[in-house]
């Protein structure tokens, strides 16, 4: 089934699932820059960027990008690109809430729910 998707997309998923968010972002960036109307890829890039901001403790930007990605992906529900978009949107909304909570209370150590992409 994976062979029906572009290799850049599959590389994005592999790298993202390995926690290599910057690399996953770059794997999809070239394809997206050729067709910026592809809001699905834009959302995935934002999702990876949100994780990068989380790792950098830029919680405001993490929350912002998690929400933006969730909003863009909602248009592709219930499934797209082999992904369960409904579940992914719910998880990203939770991630945004967690990032907001962490930003507002840096004394606590909040954890993001895991995001695993399965095609």
What are these regions (language model features)?
Residues 1-2, 9-10, 83-119:
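Intrinsically disordered, low-complexity, charge-biased linker/tail regions
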Residues 59-77:
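TPR/TPR-like (Sel1-like) alpha-helical repeat modules
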Residues 32-37:
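Solenoid-like repeat scaffolds
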Residues 38-41, 73-87:
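Boundary/linker segments of alpha-helical solenoid repeat arrays
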């Amino acid at each position: 089934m994976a062979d029906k998707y572009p290799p850049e997309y599959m590389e994005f998923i592999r790298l993202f699932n390995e926690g290599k968010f910057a690399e996953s972002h770059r794997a999809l960036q070239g394809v997206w820059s050729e067709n910026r109307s592809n809001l699905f890829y834009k959302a995935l890039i934002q999702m990876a960027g949100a994780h990068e901001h989380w790792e950098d403790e830029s919680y405001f930007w993490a929350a912002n990008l998690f929400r933006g990605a969730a909003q863009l992906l909602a248009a592709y529900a219930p499934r797209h690109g082999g992904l369960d978009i409904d579940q992914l949107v719910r998880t990203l909304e939770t991630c945004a809430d967690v990032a907001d909570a962490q930003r507002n209370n840096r004394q606590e150590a909040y954890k993001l729910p895991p995001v695993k992409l399965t095609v």
